[in-house]
UniProtKB/Swiss-Prot annotation:
Pathway: Isoprenoid biosynthesis; isopentenyl diphosphate biosynthesis via DXP pathway; isopentenyl diphosphate from 1-deoxy-D-xylulose 5-phosphate: step 3/6. It comes from Clavibacter sepedonicus (Clavibacter michiganensis subsp. sepedonicus). Its EC number is 2.7.1.148. Catalyzes the phosphorylation of the position 2 hydroxy group of 4-diphosphocytidyl-2C-methyl-D-erythritol. Belongs to the GHMP kinase family. IspE subfamily. GO terms for molecular function: 4-(cytidine 5'-diphospho)-2-C-methyl-D-erythritol kinase activity; ATP binding. Gene3D superfamilies: 3.30.230.10, GHMP kinase, C-terminal domain. It holds the Pfam family GHMP_kinases_N. NCBIfam families: ispE, PRK03188.1. ATP binds at P104, I105, A106, G107, G108, M109, G110, G111, G112, S113, A114. It is an enzyme of class 2 (transferase). GO terms for biological process: isopentenyl diphosphate biosynthetic process, methylerythritol 4-phosphate pathway; terpenoid biosynthetic process. The lineage of its organism: Bacteria, Bacillati, Actinomycetota, Actinomycetes, Micrococcales. This is 4-diphosphocytidyl-2-C-methyl-D-erythritol kinase.
Length: 312
């Protein structure tokens, strides 16, 4: 993550989407939230933010995916990011943002968080506000749990709400094939379904961890750069509730594994399904097979860098 020391007239910043290769959800807290422990991997689907000076704050969208249902008002996460940076630095002036989106919307891959991360970095450069890495990460955490990771990128362990990051070593490149649903799944609904499941089956299952942790096998597989090892330990506590709310995802998981995927996992709260392939050739074959089944499919690799300035 880098920023310029002097202001510019226009800035282009880019931030990646993510896959949660492991996600363990702790018990429901009194404040209504859950602590989590997750292994994030940034993947090669990007949000490109073009920032230009303006008197006010505005945003428009383009890109490879349908953005018609996105809000362009003040509650948009990118607008909130720009306003937060301006407020925290005392900057007077606004910004117009043009965001080219390639990360699926409401797909559990952190597209909105990537928008916010790239906006923070773009506006910091545009305005010459010279925030440090730690300052940008802290601002990101105010905006959402996944925003700090979109700034940092690579592979990392997230704890707390997912915003307390520690880097994790990942060797080599992992090949992912992503099946994109034509619908979104509400993150609060998925967490709510998880809580209801745990309450219904409290006598039959182990209680949720108060302080969740990422399994050591996940860290070992990432360090080894071994997709076969990683396939054995992919884990998501939100997968079962997501499948309950969207049963068709189970058929997608089965289809991918029948066509050569080492394993499949619902990414985050879904509904994107991420399939891990053994190598590039296997990923291409899987992409063709899933496309033939009339699924919307994207191939991506990870890990990749976090938010960075492209021009400006």
């Amino acid at each position: 993550m880098t920023s310029a020391a002097t202001s510019s007239d226009a800035v282009h910043a880019r931030a990646p989407g993510k896959i949660n290769v492991s996600l363990t959800v702790g018990a429901l807290q009194e404040d209504g939230y859950h602590d989590v422990a997750t292994a994030y991997q940034a993947v090669s689907l990007y949000e490109d933010v073009y920032a230009t000076r303006s008197d006010g704050f505005s945003v428009e969208f383009g890109g490879s995916i349908d953005t018609s249902r996105l809000t362009t008002g003040g509650d948009n996460l990118a607008i909130r990011a720009a306003r937060l940076l301006a407020r925290s630095t005392g900057h007077r002036g606004g910004v117009h943002l043009r965001i080219e989106k390639d990360v699926p919307i409401a797909g559990g891959m952190g597209g909105g968080s990537a928008d916010a991360a790239a906006t923070l970095l773009a506006c910091d450069t545009l305005w010459g506000t010279e925030r440090t890495r730690d300052q940008l990460l802290a601002l990101g955490a105010e905006l959402g749990a996944d925003v700090p990771f979109a700034l940092a990128g690579g592979t990392a362990i997230g704890t707390g709400r997912g915003d307390r990051l520690s880097p994790a070593l990942a060797k080599g490149t992992f090949q992912w094939v992503l099946a994109i649903a034509e619908f979104g799944v509400s993150t609060p609904d998925v967490y709510g379904e998880l809580d209801k499941h745990r309450e219904r089956h409290a006598q039959d299952i182990f209680p949720a961890q108060q302080i969740p942790q990422v399994d050591s096998g996940v860290l070992q597989a990432l360090r080894a750069g071994d997709p076969h090892m990683l396939a054995e330990v992919l884990h998501n506590d939100l997968q079962a509730p997501a499948l309950h709310l969207a049963p068709g995802l189970g058929e997608v998981l089965q289809l991918g594994e029948e066509n050569g995927a080492l394993a499949g996992i619902v990414s985050g709260s879904g509904p994107t399904v991420a399939f891990l392939a053994s190598d590039l050739d296997s990923a291409l074959e899987l992409q063709i097979a899933l496309s033939a089944a009339r699924l919307q499919v994207i191939r991506a690799t990870g890990p990749v860098h976090g938010a960075r300035i492209i021009t400006g």
